[in-house]
Amino acid sequence: MRKVILFCAATLFSLLSFAQESDADIVKVGDNIPAFTLHSTANGTINSADLKGKVVLINIFATWCGPCQSELAEVQKILWPKYKNNKDFCMLVIGREHTDDQLAEYNKRKRFTFPLYPDPKREVTGKFATKMIPRSYLIN
């Protein structure tokens, strides 16, 4: 788990210099996770309450964001194969302002094996931050 934390921290710090926008996080270290529900045609529904007791990596991205593409490629290559079968780990990759159809089309090209969740109106991502992607949160 230490490697996950180090990987996430390194990714966050390295990508801050490439971010499209800047804004303070709404969620701060020590805060409880905001209540939310994500719906995906391909991956079903997940509620924040379902995540209790798990280590959760939340990644917020957009299909047009260059740094997001680099980060997700690394997640696919390094992180997902190692932790995808760990019942105490959950990864939520959330497409900010994207629909299910847009994410399905995007994933045809990218061939990611981790689940993608749409957030077309920023109803979930807006509870974490209003700007700046990619953005990742490690929650335990």
Annotate each language-model stretch with its function:
Residues 1-4:
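Positively charged n-region of N-terminal signal peptides that target proteins for export
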Residues 54-55, 70-94, 108:
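Conserved helix-turn-beta segment immediately C-terminal to the redox Cys motif
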